[in-house]
């Protein structure tokens, strides 16, 4: 899970990409919600905002704009 705009968001489905990068862990590195990890990249596919129904990434991003270079906690 991660926190964004004071809301907890659970990652329900994701894909790990074994790729080198130079970003700080937690940094959003694409507009499709790919997140830099200590080693590799996490491509989020499905998530759930607190008190909301689960959404695939396309549905979620239609209603929530998480900008590239945002550092998630």
UniProtKB/Swiss-Prot annotation:
The keyword Hydrolase does not apply. Keywords: Protein biosynthesis, Transferase. GO terms for molecular function: methionyl-tRNA formyltransferase activity. It is an enzyme of class 2 (transferase). It comes from the Bacteria. Its EC number is 2.1.2.9. Coiled coil: none annotated. It holds the Pfam family Formyl_trans_C. It catalyses: L-methionyl-tRNA(fMet) + (6R)-10-formyltetrahydrofolate = N-formyl-L-methionyl-tRNA(fMet) + (6S)-5,6,7,8-tetrahydrofolate + H(+). Belongs to the Fmt family. Attaches a formyl group to the free amino group of methionyl-tRNA(fMet). The formyl group appears to play a dual role in the initiator identity of N-formylmethionyl-tRNA by promoting its recognition by IF2 and preventing the misappropriation of this tRNA by the elongation apparatus. This is Methionyl-tRNA formyltransferase. It comes from Rickettsia parkeri. The gene is fmt.
């Amino acid at each position: 899970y991660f926190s964004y705009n004071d809301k907890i968001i659970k990652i329900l489905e994701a894909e790990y990409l074994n790729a080198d990068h130079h970003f700080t862990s937690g940094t959003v590195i694409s507009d499709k919600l790919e997140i830099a990890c200590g080693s590799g990249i996490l491509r989020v596919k499905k998530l759930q905002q607190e008190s909301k129904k689960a959404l695939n990434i396309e549905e979620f991003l239609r209603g929530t704009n998480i900008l590239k270079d945002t550092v998630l906690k």
